[in-house]
C-alpha cells in the first residue's frame, strides 16, 4: 500500500483450507479476508484466487455481500461435472455443490462472475459424463474457463483406470473450449454500455472488478482506478473510455 499498489490477490494451492491448521480456533478463509479488509481500510481492492466449491464459507459470503472491496470474481476449482468422475478424482465436491455455491454467491452479490477449471478425458469418462461438464458450465454460468486435456502420469491411481482414447480426449477438450469461448463472448457482450471500475496496469490496459480485461482509448497512468464506459469488444477483451 505504501508503494501505491491498489489490489492484493490472495492465492494458494487450496485457499479454502486456510485456518484448518489452527485446531483450537474456528478460522476460515472468510475470517482472514475480513481481517485484512478491516486492518487495511485504505486498500481499494482485494481479490481471492482459486476456491474449492465443496462447502460454502458463510463468513466469506458475508464479506462478499457487505464489503465491495472484495472483488466480485471467484475462480472455482471444479475439474468436472460428473459426480462419479469427481469421486474418482478424489474431489470433495459434487455437481450440486457447485450449483449451491454459485447460487449463494449470486444471492449475496448479483454482479459476481465465476471462472473454473475443467479436465477433458479423465479415465473412465464416457460421453454422458462429458456432457455433464458441458451442462454444469451452462447451468452455473461459468465465464472464465480453463480447459485441460487429461494427461496420463505413471504410478498414479488414475493411470490404472481404463484410459480414454487420445483422439476422443482432444475432441472433448475442443467442445469444452468452444463452449468456453461462447460463454466468455456472451459475457463480453453483456458488458457493452456498462460503466466499470478499471485498475490500469500498463499501456492503458487493466482489469475491471469482475476481471474483464479492458483497453482504454485514453492514456491513463498505471496503478490508477478509473470509471470506464465499455464501448465494444476488441481482440483482447473490451474497449472502453474514461470520457462521458
Question: Residue ranges of each PLM-predicted region?
Answer:
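Conserved SAM/AdoMet-binding glycine-rich loop
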Residues: 2-126, 138
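Active-site proximal loops enriched in glycine and acidic residues that flank catalytic Cys/His/Asp
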Residues: 12, 50, 78-80, 116-120, ...
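Generic alpha-helical hydrophobic packing signal
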Residues: 42-43, 67-70, 134, 138, ...
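A structural motif corresponding to the C-terminal lobe/cap of the Radical SAM core domain
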Residues: 72, 84-199
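Short, charged low-complexity intrinsically disordered segments located at boundaries
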Residues: 63-67, 92-93, 133-134, 202-211
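Terminal RNA-binding accessory module
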Residues: 160-244
